[in-house]
Amino acid sequence: MLKQYIEKIISGQNLTQQEAGEAMDIILTGQANDSQLASFLSVLKMKGESLDEIAGFAKTLISHADHVPHSKPVMCNCGTGGDTKNTFNISTTAAFVLAAGGVTVAKHGNRGVSSASGSSDVLGELGVRYNLTPENAGKIIDDIGVAFLFAPAFNKAMKYVAKTRQELGYRTVFNLLGPIINPAGLDYQMVGIYDKNLTELIAGVLKEIGVKHALVIASEDGMDEISTNAPTKVSELKDGTIRTYEINPADYGFQPGSMADYAGGTPAENAAITLRILQGQEQGPKRDIVILNAGAALYAGNKAESIEAGIQLAQKMIDSGKALQKLQQLVAETQELGA
């Protein structure tokens, strides 16, 4: 059933947004066999995915997900993974700083992709239970302002692509789609991606699916985070327009180090790093990169007038213990509601 779409892509044409949605619907209802799916993903990658194609895929994926009911504007700060840098869980740690700063966070994540420890791995070590019903996840979002949405539990139709993605062994459009198909429906977002040539494209997709304010980031040293060691390219979506600029960490007083400064390890080791940062015991590069990323995300979440103001707020949220308190609240409530 994917044949007509594969043939159009082979001819060098982009699918319309409607056609992309139709193709994804075929995939997510199990109507495409493995060879068709592999062909579709491969020829799409060779052509290069267009904005309308990614937006059409994303809208259909979101429509197939288990929607999370909640009453607040929400944000997600996450990356595509796949940057191969094996860092500790920077965005997961930053999520608690965001929540303390007044951003409502629905963090959509999975097990490790670019590291040995994905967000669900480290949260499990910290005592967070993430097997939540959509209703319980929404309750946690409204109650404490931060919840973790385990992607496979909310996007069950993705089971139809898991085997083929694994067998292909290279990045496909699903790597880009992962961070933008949040089942809570996002108002704000900070997305880290592995390819700096795609920041404007993904910002355009976020505009198309209804995100109001977003930063799409890719650092010069290859991280899907804002780096404290190198400039980071940013495409910002705000008020319906997209502008691209560079964040230079030195402008905010951060001293460059080496990639080894951010090295992660096992889930237990990464959980210990997160705890030390939130407890105020960790000073230096690991704390710095969390503060820089949380500061930018506080700006994207409209809780700070600028990235600089966001950085100052992020520092206060850690030093006051409020960020740690958000983690403690999440552990307590998921222990009660989770499985």
Question: Model regions: which residues?
Answer:
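Acidic, glycine-rich active-site loops and adjacent beta-strand->loop/helix elements
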Residues: 79-84, 109-115, 154, 220-221
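A glycine-rich phosphate/pyrophosphate-binding beta-strand-loop-alpha-helix module
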Residues: 41, 88-144
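Short amphipathic alpha-helical face segments that pack within enzyme cores
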Residues: 39, 93-97, 289, 293-296
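Glycine-rich anion-binding loops and their surrounding alpha/beta cores
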Residues: 8, 63-66, 87, 102, ...
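Acidic, glycine/proline-rich low-complexity segments that act as flexible tails and inter-domain linkers
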Residues: 1-87, 101, 105, 256-260, ...
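Gly/Ser/Thr-rich beta-alpha loop segments that engage phosphate groups in nucleotides
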Residues: 14, 83-84, 114, 120, ...
